[in-house]
Amino acid sequence: MEISMTSHINNAVETFRLEIETLEKLKNSIDENFEKACEIILENNRDKSRVIITGMGKSGHIGKKMAATFASTGTPAFFVHPGEAGHGDFGMITKNDVLIAISNSGTSSEIMGLLPMIKHLDIPIIAITSNPKSILARNSNVTLNLHVDKEACPLNLAPTSSTTATLVLGDALAIALLKAKNFSEKDFAFSHPNGALGRKLILKVENIMRKGNEIPIVKPTDNIRKAILEISDKGVGNTLVAENNTLLGIFTDGDLRRMFEAESFNSQRAISEVMTKNPKSISKEEMAITALEKMEKYEITSLAVVDNGHNILGIVTMHDLIKLELR
């Protein structure tokens, strides 16, 4: 039987409509139980507890995402599969933790099987379910009712509206906790060290600068030929000029090109005669993004890294910073 494109679109729109209705109903039902759930988590977090999230099937998939969102927004959390918990993983849960148990029906046999041990630990249980009279709800400290009467699935079988509601409720909890803890952009960066924001807010110059034998350095009495060899060897595009490791100047490949264009080029001249004195530098404690901004401002491709006495500690290059994708 041929199905028209219009039918596909109508089915999609109907799915959106049903799930949006579910979310509207959930939004309008948020009450003091949501407040209690947040307070339970915040109170236990003061004792460095974790939020343990469990759920079976599609609820479990949503639970994994919920745990990941909690963990990345300042609430330590991880997912425990209820089936595996019954075969050893229950040992991951401690008496200081808080459990969020997800079951739309509130009767998941795997979660029911864990209730005696959870009660034995005497840890707070937050139930997420559409059945406030279920065994799970009756054994919980607080129940967050999803209020899902019908799935978007026309068979009313595949978890659709219920999983969407659970996902959004989890996000609502995470954001409420984030705001309660005054979780900042910098805090977020620490939990995302490999992301662009993390690198921007965490990486310092000392973390990415070239050190030791990687630093191109010549003495002021060395000739231009020696400087050219140093530039070629270190591949930075310039060489620092230093006396007893104190920064005096810099000689770049741009300086070299301009000298070649002059009629009186002499590779035996002392580098001190042609170097740029008092070059731009930066402290190792500065942020990497600051080094990038400084290079862009002065239209240069590297910065000497020095201490308060102008002693050379390293060199940071535009090329290295671009590879970090700080923006």
Swiss-Prot record:
- Pathway, according to UniProt? Carbohydrate biosynthesis; 3-deoxy-D-manno-octulosonate biosynthesis; 3-deoxy-D-manno-octulosonate from D-ribulose 5-phosphate: step 1/3; Bacterial outer membrane biogenesis; lipopolysaccharide biosynthesis
Please list the GO terms describing molecular function. arabinose-5-phosphate isomerase activity; carbohydrate derivative binding; metal ion binding
Q: Name one GO biological process term.
A: lipopolysaccharide biosynthetic process
- Per UniProt, substrate binds at 74-75, 81, 87, 113-122, 147-149, 221, 273
| EC annotation from Swiss-Prot or TrEMBL | 5.3.1.13
Reaction(s) catalysed (UniProt annotation): D-arabinose 5-phosphate = D-ribulose 5-phosphate
Annotated Zn(2+) binding sites: 81
The annotated modulation of its activity is:
Inhibited by hydroxamates, mimicking the putative enediol reaction intermediate. Most potent inhibition, with an IC(50) of 0.7 uM, is obtained with the 4 carbon-based hydroxamate containing acetyl moieties.
Record's keyword terms, sorted: Carbohydrate metabolism, CBS domain, Isomerase, Lipopolysaccharide biosynthesis, Metal-binding, Repeat, Zinc
Q: Which Pfam families match?
A: CBS, SIS
Q: Which family does it belong to?
A: Belongs to the SIS family. GutQ/KpsF subfamily.
What assembly does the database describe for this protein?
Answer: Homotetramer.
Protein's name in the database? Arabinose 5-phosphate isomerase KdsD
Species source reads Francisella tularensis subsp. tularensis (strain SCHU S4 / Schu 4)
Q: Which gene encodes it?
A: kdsD
